[in-house]
Amino acid sequence: MADKNSEIIEALERDWRDALCSKDVERMSALVHPDFILIGMRSTGPFMMHRNEWLDAIQKRDVESIELEIADAKAFDKMLVGTVYAKWRLRYLGRVIEDCVVLTDVWVFEDDRWQAIRRHSTPSPSGGCTPA
């Protein structure tokens, strides 16, 4: 998918990925809106994590790699919604974790920049890391 919306979301997602992998807290803080919430599913059940909690938790992880594929992108005035397939490999609390997830990211344009205000993360339904 090579339309303008996909290109914008792909650039934002790459920037976010690069900030995560390099533990660039300043850049991550700039990319996530003050009202950011991560909503997801773990083996223990559903969870919600607000911005400061997420920024704190992400610093305890060593992200080795994140592969991204933009499956869909939609634009609405000052909002973008992206569906992203991601394959993560990270170390957290001494364990290596590999996971394939589908992300729904909602970006808002405020103060002359795009910021993620919501991220929903769920295990990939196909068990793979690409659209079915």
What is the role of each PLM region?
Residues K4-E7, V25-K78, E98:
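A solvent-exposed, acidic/Ser-Thr-rich amphipathic alpha-helical stretch
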Residues W16, W54-L55, L68-K74, A86-W88, ...:
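Hydrophobic/aromatic beta-strand elements that line small-molecule binding cavities or substrate pockets
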Residues G40, V84-A86, R118:
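Residue-level recognition of conserved beta-strand positions in structured domain cores
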Residues A73-L80, R95, W107-R113:
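A short, structured loop/turn motif at beta-sheet edges
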Residues R89-E98:
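Short, cysteine-centered beta-strand-loop-beta hairpins and adjacent loop/turn segments enriched
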Residues C100-G128:
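Short beta-strand edge/turn micro-motifs at domain boundaries
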